Amino acid sequence: LGDVYKRQGDKVLVHGGGRSATKLAAQLGIESKMVNGRRITDAETLKVVTMVYGGLVNKNIVAGLQALGVNALGLTGADMNLMRSDKRPVAEVDYGFVGDVKEVNADLLASLIHQGIVPVLAPLTHDKQGHMLNTNADTIAGEAAKALAKHFEVTLMFCFEKKGVLLDENDDESVIPEIDRIAFKGYVEQGIIQGGMIPKLENAYQAIDAGVKQVIITQASEIHQGKGTRVF
């Protein structure tokens, strides 16, 4: 959190919490089911992720930021109708109570930012029919960035365990400094970029198409330096 705090300018923080959700589910005797790295969210699992993402993880992050003097506010998509989703239709896989974002209250987010508040968004949305929906954190970040691009000059930063997109997954120092669309296509065809990094970069280009200035993929510890892979 200290590294996030050091990052200059207005901020919105989006977090995950999958490992904590898996741990609590196991303690409660609820099996965690994953397909292609995505969680199957049945009714019992939805209760777990709502508790963990919207409660435990979110409020601990808010408390940590407050300790640093950051006026943070923890939110889910249901709060003040911040982010509405439709339940994902069943195709090859039934992901259960998983949401695809359809509407973002950009004016609300912009208002909070103008008040000097740092919104901390949990990866949960709602369908406006009384149901919470588990929603991918990268998607939440991308949708928030696209919505805020109408109000601000936005840089979207995806943080994960590596220093950026790697040329060699076994070499943590082989960070690709910049990737344009042509290079992205080539890296995918060569198998250099694969798995979960593909949708992350697809989200990045969707954000750029919607007016986001730039996207950076990096480690949390380097977020304040702007290091990593710049996507354009």
Q: Where are the predicted features?
A:
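C-terminal catalytic "cap/lid" subdomain
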Residues: D3-F232
